[in-house]
A protein has these predicted regions:
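Alpha-helical scaffold segments that mediate packing/assembly in large oligomeric complexes
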Residues: 1-43, 67-68, 83-85, 90-91, ...
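Short helix/loop capping segments that flank catalytic or ligand/cofactor-binding pockets
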Residues: 60-63, 126-127, 169-171
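Active-site lining segments that contact anionic ligands and/or coordinate catalytic metals
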Residues: 48, 92, 110-113, 122, ...
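C-terminal hydrophobic structural anchor segments
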Residues: 96-148
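Active-site proximal loops enriched in glycine and acidic residues that flank catalytic Cys/His/Asp
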Residues: 15, 52-57, 61, 76, ...
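C-terminal structural cap/anchor segments
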Residues: 53-118
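Protruding loop/beta-arch "assembly-hinge" segments enriched in small, turn-prone residues
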Residues: 150-185
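A structural signal for short secondary-structure junctions
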Residues: 43-45, 108-110, 126, 151-155, ...
Length: 185
């Protein structure tokens, strides 16, 4: 969300916001909210080629249908195993549901925060790692396991510490819309 970043722009700087649950069912409900985000981008000459949402909206998407009764989020599993990220489609575009995208709701008049996802032109975002992944292996350290100090050597254990530094650069924050749910807890 732009905290502790060396970059001048981050995704939360977008001025385009749509609150999920504000479009009445007769006008499309959550489907209408998703399309409202598309409209904000198109009116600004931007495109929408994908979505990223937090798992807190999964029940909302799975229970939402358009005016013809078709499901809003169509899951497109790529394999038979459970994935960390759930791939799917929203209004004909790639969508991913995962963990770690939400921000807390800040009570007030009106409430703020409550970001649950983003839609936009993901070619305007790049990510990478600095220096790859570094790791250390130890059989002699003492670590805390379930609140107790445990000797790796005495218990025939191995500890592996892996570290990586990742970065996300947003080229054009106007190419994104954030979706919020100010009622989320």
């Amino acid at each position: 969300h732009g905290t502790n970043t060396p970059f001048a722009q981050w995704i939360d700087q977008t001025t385009k916001t749509v609150e999920l649950g504000t479009t009445v069912k007769a006008n499309g409900g959550v489907y209408g909210d998703i399309v409202a985000g598309l409209k904000l981008l198109v009116q600004d000459g931007k495109k929408l080629n994908g979505f990223a949402f937090d798992r807190v909206v999964e029940p909302t998407f799975l229970s939402a249908v358009d005016n013809n009764g078709r499901p809003l989020f169509v899951e497109t599993p790529l394999e038979d195993t459970a994935s960390v990220v759930t791939p799917g489609r929203l209004i004909g575009r790639s969508a991913y549901i995962g963990d770690g995208l939400t921000t807390a709701v800040v009570p007030g008049t009106p409430n703020t925060g409550g970001i649950v996802g983003y839609g936009g032109d993901w070619s305007q975002a790049v990510w990478g790692t600095v220096g790859g992944i570094s790791y250390d292996v130890s059989t002699q350290a003492t670590v805390t396991i379930n609140g107790a100090l445990t000797s790796l050597w005495e218990n025939n254990l191995v500890a592996i510490r892996a570290e990586a530094e990742f970065g996300l650069l947003i080229n054009d924050v106007a190419s994104f819309v954030e979706y919020t749910d100010h009622t989320a807890s």
